């Protein structure tokens, strides 16, 4: 009888040990993953980038190379519009005087024009391109003309 009780106690001890060790592992192990991306405004002079993160999702260990495609409806459009309102990706700040076109000439601040403002300056049509007009014969080199650096300065101006 004593031997039978000893065998049963060993069996109970083994079962208890298995239950205690398995209780630390709860379910199938998973890893959490998240989509991350950077949204930038390439038209500005500075980088102006925002790092955005998607929601967390469970990634099974065998599926690390099988990341599911990001659904386009994860973020409502209102959230992105709120981000654009909070963090504008534009250099046009109302009331700052910078890039607002509130004046022209040297009296409107530092006189520094951004690249975009230089592209879109208003031109007075009455005197546009009339000062530097030359005939085609004068612009082309002739056989008798020396191509060295002799001549008038205006011949070398573009």
UniProtKB/Swiss-Prot annotation:
Q: Name one GO biological process term.
A: granzyme-mediated programmed cell death signaling pathway
Q: How is it modified after translation?
A: O-glycosylated; contains chondroitin sulfate and heparan sulfate.
Span of the secretion signal? 1-27
State the sequence repeat positions.
94-95, 96-97, 98-99, 100-101, 102-103, 104-105, 106-107, 108-109, 110-111
The record's listing under Pfam families reads: Serglycin
Report residue spans for region: 9 X 2 AA tandem repeats of [SF]-G. Answer: 94-111
Principal location class: cytoplasm
Its function, per the record, reads: Plays a role in formation of mast cell secretory granules and mediates storage of various compounds in secretory vesicles. Required for storage of some proteases in both connective tissue and mucosal mast cells and for storage of granzyme B in T-lymphocytes. Plays a role in localizing neutrophil elastase in azurophil granules of neutrophils. Mediates processing of MMP2. Plays a role in cytotoxic cell granule-mediated apoptosis by forming a complex with granzyme B which is delivered to cells by perforin to induce apoptosis.
What name appears for this protein in its UniProt entry?
Answer: Serglycin
Q: Which gene encodes it?
A: SRGN
